Design a protein with these regions (language model features):
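Class I S-adenosyl-L-methionine-dependent methyltransferase catalytic core
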Residues: 1-202
């Protein structure tokens, strides 16, 4: 994910700060890792069709703030007091390492949304990066006949003229529309990623 994100930022020469959005965020792991590894992320937006996953993502993305790290450390300290497990002690050490990586608080907005329908974004993101459902989940939960194409259409409507989109997917999946121009494609085993920029309209 990090390498893909950096390829996206390279398309914005001179840009110092980015708003990043994942419309299929799951537990928010991709965005949380990106937030710790890239100090040019100023704001994160994340959504998923599952309320349960949105709740997990909100908790993970909160670690990108000192307040969130403090809260998690308090939880772990209480678990250590109750159970004394070595795994909890290791988690506290990991948390302290994360604190050292955090240069500034990263604001995050996490919400439930079906990315094949109209997305309630207050602002257009600079970079959209997502690892889309695949396998038995290819029809997703929206009931859309072709959820992948519907997602691309909705993201085009939520984007600004310079927005860059990176999609990680099964290598058999492909984009069939004309709202996005593909800039890059790479296959890695059974998966691939493609990077796009919004097509210019006359």
């Amino acid at each position: 994910g990090n390498e893909i994100y950096r390829r996206c930022t390279a398309l914005f020469p001179g840009r110092k700060s980015f708003t990043v959005y994942d419309p299929c965020c799951g537990g928010g792991y991709l965005l949380t890792v990106l937030g710790f590894c890239n100090h040019n992320i100023g704001r994160i937006m994340a959504s998923d069709v599952s309320d349960r996953m949105v709740s997990v993502a909100a908790k993970n993305l909160a670690l990108l703030t000192l307040q969130g790290l403090d809260g998690r450390e308090r939880e772990l300290t209480e678990l250590i007091r109750q159970y004394g497990k070595s795994s909890h002690l290791e988690a506290v050490e990991s948390l302290r390492r994360l604190r050292n990586r955090l240069v500034r608080n990263v604001e995050s907005t996490v919400f439930t949304a079906d990315c094949t329908q109209t997305l309630p974004l207050a602002d257009a993101p600079d970079i959209i990066i997502t690892d889309v459902p695949y396998g038995n989940l290819v029809s997703w939960e929206s009931g859309e006949k072709d959820s992948l194409q519907a997602m691309y259409r909705q993201l085009a409507m939520a984007a600004h003229s310079g927005t860059v989109l990176a999609v990680i997917m099964d290598k058999r999946q492909r984009y069939k529309g004309d709202s996005w121009n593909r800039l890059e494609r790479q296959v890695i085993g059974k998966r691939k990623f493609e990077i796009y920029r919004l097509a210019k309209t006359d």
